[in-house]
UniProtKB/Swiss-Prot annotation:
This is Dermonecrotic toxin LdSicTox-alphaIB1avi. Its cofactor is Mg(2+). It comes from Loxosceles deserta. Mg(2+) binds at residues 25, 27, 85. Its EC number is 4.6.1.-.
Length: 273
């Protein structure tokens, strides 16, 4: 999965997919009442990027729905996965469940079109703080009470705080999550970060009793770092330059081993060689 980083304006969906992304990451900020409000990152952000592009969250969802609904004039067949980077650090811990409920309502109405031919992309809820694990239950309860528990088949999870792998595993246990797990590792492109924790995550993914289904690394803008991440065995790379990642995947060393994921590749299944 080539994951376009910080895609917060509707116009950027086309831009990143046209550069080679089959997945995008979108920031979601919340108001004081835990309503998802804007797709907005803010300052500071990655080097070389404009930090302040934004939409109202529900409007972004409508644009995203068009981009992922077959038959729509804006449809992109290859856009198959969306990571919502949930900026919950502005909330109190006890608001996490409410944030999940309100997020589910927004997605149900504006993205899934109340279960009637909505967008088809798989969705990852990426949570920065382990203490906010109740967001997941709130989200699930709402889809169930609104009569659409089947949409949970399209939803996965990520804790993005670079926490100890063991602590993340314990948190999923508390949250009652037993699958659909992506594990992120990374740092802003302005700084360097080694691949030690990525390798631990990959080892967990490939063990018989691990909790991880997929591992992604962020934010990668250079060819050399891309090669290092692929050599470590990641499933996804988040980038400001999808064309750079696509270029490396085309190199003979990687062409035989990796391919770009399509809609038929289940993002919740651990890939077995």
């Amino acid at each position: 999965w080539i994951m376009g980083h910080m895609v917060n304006a509707i116009a950027q969906i086309d831009e990143f997919v046209n550069l080679g992304a089959n997945s995008i990451e979108t920031d979601v900020s919340f108001d004081d009442s835990a309503n998802p409000e804007y797709t907005y990152h803010g300052v500071p952000c990655d080097c070389g990027r404009t930090c302040t592009k934004w939409e109202y969250f529900n409007e972004f969802l409508k644009g995203l729905r068009k981009a992922t609904t077959p038959g729509d004039s804006k449809y992109h067949e290859k856009l198959v996965l969306v990571v919502f980077d949930l900026k919950t650090s502005s909330l109190y811990d006890n608001q996490a469940s409410d944030a999940g409920k309100k997020l589910a309502k927004s997605l149900l109405q504006n993205y899934w079109n109340n279960g009637n031919n909505g967008g088809r992309a798989y969705i990852v809820l990426s949570i920065p703080n382990l203490a906010h694990y109740k967001l997941i239950a709130g989200f699930k309860e709402t889809l169930t009470s609104e009569g659409h528990p089947e949409l949970m088949d399209k939803v996965g999870y990520d804790f993005s705080g670079n926490d100890e792998i063991g602590d993340v595993a314990k948190t999923y246990k508390k949250a009652g999550v037993t699958g659909h797990v992506w594990q992120s590792d990374g740092i802003t492109n302005c700084l360097l970060r080694g691949l030690d924790r990525v390798r631990k995550a990959v080892a967990n993914r490939d063990s018989s009793n691990g909790y991880i289904n997929k591992v992604y690394y962020w934010t990668v803008d250079k060819r050399a770092t891309t090669r290092d991440a692929l050599d470590a065995g990641v499933d996804g790379i988040m980038t400001n330059y999808p064309d750079v990642i696509a270029g490396v995947l085309n190199e003979s060393a990687y062409k035989a081993k990796f391919r770009i994921a399509s809609y038929d590749d289940n993002p919740w299944e651990t890939f077995k060689n």
